[in-house]
Swiss-Prot record:
Transmembrane region(s): 484-504
Any one GO MF annotation of this record: dynein complex binding
Compartments, record wording: Nucleus outer membrane; Nucleus; Chromosome, Telomere; Nucleus envelope
Full protein name: Protein KASH5
Coiled coil region boundaries: 164-360
Membrane topology: Single-pass type IV membrane protein
Domain of life: Eukaryota
UniProt GO cellular component terms: chromosome, telomeric region; lateral element; meiotic nuclear membrane microtubule tethering complex; meiotic spindle pole; nuclear outer membrane
Organism: Bos taurus (Bovine)
Length: 525
């Protein structure tokens, strides 16, 4: 339905424009029908409570459409608005009112004959919007005539004028219906455009949201990029430091490789030295074992030598005692010899006269001696004669009629003891005395310092009395006076004395095994 031209700039237009601006701000475009229904609800709800009584709405529609309460359509609308039948207490909100009114208008359009009523209702609604809210005159049917409504009361006498005006109104109504259809089509196109615009706006809003999200994401990416730049700078610095450290580590590694090579060379030398030391230690161990065995043998030999030395010490002590006894005996014999020398010196003067008788007596004494002693004496005399013939000048000297003094006698005793004959089967004197034999130069030098020399048992034979007689080859050192006038008994006494000294001074050789240590080279330090 079109609004009058004079009312285009009125409060209704302003309210409509304001509602449109508010709807645009909310993003919702309303149709003309919804605008009329909203204006009807707002006219019935001046306090803006959001709920309106059903009776109030029905009274307003009755006043606008000119229908009575008995109208079937209004009763249907009342039943739709008050399905529970609450009566005057029934209320309805805007959403329910809009839904019920849309359904009611659709049902009336299907039944037909609602165009005039709608036009009248729309004109009344638009006219009622110009009135102040809450005006009681709007609800009064008597005052509807002044606002463009019709009085349902019976017509007055000016019927002809009313019919003519009614025809004019019908013509204008038809004209306005065509214009209304055009406007509805334009409204539909506008609604379609607004729907498209809404879709575009929603798409733009979505795009704006996506753009904002992309912008926020870009900002986040930018911040992350800045962080990555700072991180890259720090990583570059770390890379530089790591490169420097790597170069330093490489130099250190080269130095360590050189040190390792030197250490390997030293290790090889040390291994060679260790092998040499090991071999040397093995050699020393073997030498140590050999020396241990030698030491054990030497200790054993030393023990045996100690036993031998103790035995020899005891034997030497016994010989010392015997020697003292012999010395005492020889002292007594020397005294007797000196006494006899004095007697001989006294009787020397009368010896010339009795030389012949002495010769005879001497021959007799010689015959009386044992055969061995006689042979000895004859050998001595022959040797003395040979010495006198060999040394005539010495024979001219005065023959000593005295025996040697005490020193010469001691030397003679020692000489006789040394020159005593031994049995041809006896061992070497060095074996008895314990002297080491000289090593032959052909023998190879041995590595050992001490070599035990163990000799076998030496069979010793006791001297026979027949062998202890004066042997002519070993008695050349005996000093006997060459005076031919010595009495034979005195000479025999002297010979017996010498024989007793020789027999008593002879010591038996040892009969135990002879042990000896022979140094073949200087002992080790």
């Amino acid at each position: 339905m079109d609004m009058p031209e004079d009312q285009a700039g009125g409060p209704t237009a302003k309210m409509y424009l304001w509602d449109q601006a508010e709807d645009r701000s909310l993003g919702t475009l309303l149709s003309l029908e919804e605008q009329i229904l909203n204006s009807t609800f707002e006219a019935c709800d001046p306090q803006r409570t959001g709920t309106v009584a059903v009776t109030h709405l029905l009274a307003y529609l009755e006043a606008v459409t000119g229908r009575g309460p008995q109208d079937a359509r209004l009763q249907t609308l009342a039943c739709s608005l008050d399905p529970s039948g609450e009566g005057p207490q029934a209320t309805v909100d805007l959403d329910t009112f809009l839904v019920v009114m849309r359904d009611w208008i659709t049902a009336c359009q299907l039944d037909g004959g609602l165009e005039l009523e709608e036009e009248t209702a729309f004109e009344g609604a638009l006219t009622s919007q110009q009135l102040p809210s809450g005006c009681p005159e709007v609800e009064d049917p008597a005052n509807l005539e002044s606002f463009g409504g019709e009085d349902p009361r019976p017509e007055l006498p000016a019927t002809a004028d009313l019919l003519s005006s009614l025809e004019d109104l019908e013509l204008s109504n038809r004209r306005l219906a065509g214009e209304n259809a055009k406007l509805q089509r334009s409204v539909e196109t506008a609604e379609e455009g607004s729907a498209r615009l809404g879709e575009e706006i929603s798409a733009l809003r979505k795009q704006l949201r996506s753009t904002q999200q992309a912008l926020q994401l870009a900002r986040g990416v930018d911040e992350e990029l800045e962080d990555l730049k700072t991180l890259a700078k720090s990583l570059e610095e770390q890379n530089r430091s790591l490169l420097a450290q790597a170069r330093h580590t490489e130099k250190e590694q080269q130095r360590l490789v050189a040190e390792m090579e030197t250490l390997q060379e030293e290790n090889g030398k040390l291994l060679a030295e260790r092998d040499g030391v090991k071999r040397r230690s093995e050699e020393l161990a073997s030498e140590k074992d050999i020396l241990k065995r030698q030491l054990y043998e030497c200790e054993h030999l030393i023990c045996q030598r100690d036993a031998i030395l103790s035995e020899r010490t005891r034997h030497a002590e016994s010989l010392t005692k015997t020697l003292e006894e012999y010395r005492a005996t020889t002292q007594e014999l020397r005294l007797e010899i000196s006494h006899l020398e004095e007697q001989l010196s006294q009787t020397q003067e009368g010896l010339d006269e009795l030389s012949e008788g002495a010769q005879v007596r001497r021959v007799d004494c010689t015959n009386l001696l044992p055969p061995s002693l006689g042979v000895e004496l004859q050998a001595i005399q022959q040797r003395n004669l040979q010495e006198e013939s060999a040394h005539p000048q010495e024979g001219r000297e005065e023959p000593s009629t005295r025996l040697p003094r005490r020193e010469e006698e001691d030397g003679a005793e020692i000489q006789v003891m040394v020159d005593l004959p031994l049995h041809p089967e006896d061992s070497h004197p060095g074996d008895i005395l314990g002297n080491p034999p000289e090593s032959s130069p052909s023998e190879p030098e041995l590595q050992q310092a001490l070599v035990p020399m163990v000799k076998e048992l030496v069979p010793v034979r006791r001297p026979v009395w027949g062998q202890l007689c004066l042997w002519p080859l070993h008695l050349r050192r005996l000093r006997v006076t060459r005076h031919l006038l010595i009495p034979a008994p005195l000479l025999g006494l002297l010979l017996l004395l010498l024989l007793s000294v020789l027999l008593l001074g002879q010591s038996p050789p040892p009969t135990w095994p002879h042990l000896q240590l022979c140094y073949l080279q200087p002992p080790p330090v």
